[in-house]
């Protein structure tokens, strides 16, 4: 039973938005804030896809690149965890992707684990591009993350004196994947490690690479209508 959760971004196509049905709503606790969240759902090829609705955070002209991205994605992580009992879904594994979901494991294991509903859940964290890390000032520990300063001071959430969402995702993951076995090796070296190679080397026994998949029907250059000209292996002489 695999289900997906994403923010309800403005950029989602109207054809999908027309299918969305409200499922539940409630309040997310984020540090000192109490914030509304809504959950809408579609069935996409037999898979349930949930959309976290909060227009203040997600009704914008692009997906990310805002001054409050630290707050937006901390909110998203807490909203996902908060909604699970309300939709009656108790996953064995939560698969998180990149820095935007880096706090999922932090919140799960430092806060939500107090509730037996969550205690069996594990985190898989996938790194697509280590360059983008979600780096923020230490002050967000109190103002946004709302967890003890100790988690910064002991290095769990800290890198180079800042809160680092990417590192947080790795520290709290039960297992880490990257986009290839080669990349999994490369990021253990300073040139590719983006200041996180030291931690990555300590965690290498729970890191592996999985090659990105490709839908050969959707991305078939012989039939693809979105490219300037179709072609096959026979188009170009040897």
What are the language-model segments listed below?
Residues 1-238:
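Catalytic cores of nucleotide-sugar-dependent glycosyltransferases that transfer UDP/GDP/TDP-activated
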């Amino acid at each position: 039973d695999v289900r997906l959760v994403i923010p309800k971004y403005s950029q989602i196509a109207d054809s999908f938005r027309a299918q969305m049905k409200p499922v539940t709503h409630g309040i997310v606790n984020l540090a000192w804030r109490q914030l509304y969240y809504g959950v809408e759902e579609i069935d996409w090829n037999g898979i349930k896809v949930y959309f976290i609705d909060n227009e203040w955070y997600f009704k914008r002209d692009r997906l990310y690149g805002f001054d409050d991205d630290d707050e937006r994605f901390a909110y998203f992580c807490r909203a996902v965890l908060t909604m699970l009992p309300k939709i009656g879904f108790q996953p064995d594994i939560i698969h998180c992707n990149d820095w935007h979901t880096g706090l999922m494991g932090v919140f799960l294991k430092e806060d939500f684990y107090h509730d037996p509903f969550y205690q069996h859940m594990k985190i898989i964290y996938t790194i697509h591009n280590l360059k983008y890390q979600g780096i923020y000032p230490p002050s967000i520990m109190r103002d946004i993350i709302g967890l003890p300063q100790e988690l910064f001071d002991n290095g769990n959430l800290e890198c180079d004196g800042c809160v680092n969402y990417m590192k947080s995702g790795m520290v709290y993951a039960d297992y880490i994947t990257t986009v290839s076995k080669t990349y999994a090796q490369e990021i253990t070296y300073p040139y590719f490690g983006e200041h996180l190679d030291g931690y990555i080397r300590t965690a290498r026994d729970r890191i592996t690479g999985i090659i990105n998949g490709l839908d050969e029907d959707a991305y078939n250059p012989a039939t693809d209508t979105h490219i300037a000209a179709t072609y096959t292996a026979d188009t170009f002489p040897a």
